[in-house]
Amino acid sequence: MLKDKPPIQSSLEFVSIDELVPKDHLLRKIDKVIDFNFIHDLVKDLYCADNGRPALDPTLLFKLLFIGYLYGVRSERQLIREVQVNVAYRWFLGLGLTDKVPDASTLSQNRRRRFNDSDVYQQIFDEIVLQAMRKRLVSGKVLYTDSTHLKANANKNKWVKGEAQSSSRDYLKALEEAVEEDRAQHGKKPLAPRSKEPQAREIKQSTTDPDSGYMVRDGKPKGFFYLDHRSVDGRCNIITDVHVTSGNVHDSVPYLSRLDRQRERFNFEVKAVGLDAGYFTAGICKGLEERDVYGVISYRRPTHKKGFFYKREYRYDNDRDLYLCPVDQALNYKTTDRQGYRHYQSNPRHCLTCEFKERCTSNAKGIKTVTRHVWEDSKERINQHRLSEPGKLIYKRRKETVERSFADAKQLHGYRHARFKGLEKVRAQCLMTAAAQNMKKIALLAA
């Protein structure tokens, strides 16, 4: 006989909140292996010690934020509603079943006023990495770096023309010295001093989020984005660096400085790195060789005008410092420009009567120009690494490390969109997401 079940919402029971949380719950594992006590000492200088109302425990506050990043809860109001009804969340925060959950405005005001414009988020991220190192989950020997885009909270059609300073490479000073040395060796006059004022370029600037950048890349959506330049350690896929820029900054611009930052902050002895084709620049190749790092960088076929010879068909003669065209005519050195490129030009008397002129140059005067960077030798040596057996093994792991890290962040941690407006706030989001991913990885491996 079918009977109606009596309501039990008003019944009283004696229960232990610890018994209600499954033994294999992720938050149990995180609580077991991650020490959160450092947060209190880290932020105590941001609080008044002897005045004002009692503050919300900062450790509880950041653990609350971590729950949101671990489970991809984008809204702080929704996060508070989830904590109110989720026993595991309450247990992780040290709250009883009847304890009052902090108000959403308390959470947001602390984030906006107390911790904004501070390095608290960076220090928290660094400490989680250090805890992973103490558990031998990070080697610092092989690093994988890439970038991914986060859609800015901005309408791509709401913009005005603006100006931005050209991004300066980490190796600009070294390049200037190399150019002057190369020109001197070829008997050329020194170039006029570079303007101290960085060159401005015209950009699309969002009226909603001016810090974001309008991104235009092959195979990528167009619009206003931020870029997360992330490095992952090859041992257990622990994220070791997060650097956020606007979406119109090239991947190669901050790379060397971020590599140096990891070596200094965590005392990494980096032996090898795996990078995609966006990092295959002469400056990065030279920088890796100077740091004695085995660089494995993907190759991207250069753009080629249909019907013309490929650049590889022009052979460089190092002994004579000239190029030979497909019919063995010499292209001699002419100059070295400020960007570090040597220019080699053909003799128009040979080109104008050559049967392959139409496949060689469209120059009206019959002059073919081929450029070669002053650090091209470094590029050629680094390029050979990807063809070696160790290089193939290193590059093969990119999809298992940094690419998997981004996929996990986008699929499970709400990483497709920027939650906030402004570079500093988006940087905080990226650091907290990466720290949450690291905590999960540590918990699954070490618990």
Model region roles, listed by residue range:
Residues 38, 69-72, 87-91:
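Short alpha-helix boundary/capping elements
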Residues 59-74, 79:
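N-terminal catalytic cores of NTP/NDP-binding nucleotidyl/phosphoryl-transfer enzymes
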Residues 16, 60-66, 106, 127:
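A general alpha-helix detector
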Residues 23-66, 378:
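Basic, short loop/linker segments at the boundary and entry of helix-turn-helix/winged-helix-like folds
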Residues 3-4, 72-85, 95-447:
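Anion-binding and metal-coordination hotspots
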Residues 1-28:
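Hydrophobic alpha-helical membrane-insertion signals
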Residues 16, 34-38, 94, 161, ...:
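Short, solvent-exposed coil/turn linker segments
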